[in-house]
Amino acid sequence: MKKISLLIVSLFLFPSISYSNFYDGIWEVTDVVGESWFSLKKRHIGKTQEYWKGYAGGVFFTCNYKGLVTTRDSYTIDEFLNKEEFRLFSKHKDELDMEGTEVSVTRKTCTGNYLASRKEMYPIVNFENWDKAFYLSKGVIFVMEQDWSSD
């Protein structure tokens, strides 16, 4: 009985940790928004990022079945746009298709075999349209769309 109680308490304490992946599939980079160079757009548009049952591979992040962990935080659109770490989204909100009132911010971490091999892809942002994701990196926002043709 103690084990069941501990399990239930753990589920409430750590609700945002997930080993499953609703991002499963192939995501294609369709745009680059922000302070980017032309070559950055040229290098990334059309490239893909894939997630599949513990595997991640692509233009931004690779984790070869070695501890891919997903965590998420939820915000209202106002909370999200007012957070300092997401100020670039606020600056470019007219260029981005930010529909809805709820925002999901996801962190993908690959623990690897050693601490030195730990990698992270953060933040991956969705605005109620789960077919589109935004990845903020190095002062630019990469727009990714789910490639349903790969299913």
Per-region residue spans from a language model:
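Sec-dependent N-terminal signal peptides
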Residues: 4-15
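Residue-level detector of intrinsically disordered/flexible regions characterized by low predicted structural confidence
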Residues: 4-5, 43, 104, 121
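Sec/Tat signal peptide C-region and signal peptidase I cleavage site
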Residues: 16-20
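Short, solvent-exposed loop/hinge segments that bridge or flank secondary-structure elements
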Residues: 23-24, 29-64, 105, 109-110, ...
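A mature extracytoplasmic/lumenal domain signature
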Residues: 31, 67-69, 148
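N-terminal glycine/threonine-rich, aromatic-flanked beta-hairpin/loop signature
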Residues: 38-88, 137-141
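Beta-sheet ligand-binding and adhesion/scaffold domains
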Residues: 80-151
